[in-house]
Amino acid sequence: MLPAPHTLRIVADSTDRVAWLRARNQGITATDVAKLSTPKSILNAAHDKMHGTSFTGNSYTDHGRAREPVIAAWVLENYGIEPSTNLFRSLGHPRHLATPDGVGVAANGDLHLAEIKTTSKPWRSIPRSYMRQVWWQQYVLGADRTLLVWEEHRGFVPVAPVPECRWIERDEDQIAILVGLANALIDNLDEQTRR
């Protein structure tokens, strides 16, 4: 049996954190794209890519990292989407990168992703930055939909026995906007490295 096409575009695995971070730094990731919405945000993202950021995590990110495998196991059991630690590149642009939390192939052959979040606040709607992350991952991998899964906690204790989730469908219009913003960021980075 032939490997699934997206598996031919694996760039790195986050289990080798140094190689994964090095590979991520060479391109534009879903984390980068989540912050892109204005010309000023492109400049800020370029600065962070060129000079790094001082943020290395906090108790909330530590909690999210600790809970992610537990939530990923729930996603696998209930939706058949396998946990993933792979960094993928897009088919059309090698600097467009994404590391979804889960990747699965549906019975009809469609590629489905999972993105896992933890939150200390209830959501009235899905934060826009998370939608940008999801659409970017769909674009990079060629996925049709993503199961966005979030677990609310109070004092780092989950408030419900199971996480909440919602399917996010692919949106070509939003993806086109994100690709344009990412390419503007790449142009900015390339210009800075030529100086």
Which ranges hold each PLM region?
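Contiguous, amphipathic alpha-helical segments that mediate oligomerization or scaffolding
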Residues: 60-61, 73, 186-195
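Short, well-ordered alpha-helical scaffold segments within catalytic/effector domains
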Residues: 68-72, 131-134
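Nucleic-acid nuclease catalytic cores
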Residues: 79-190
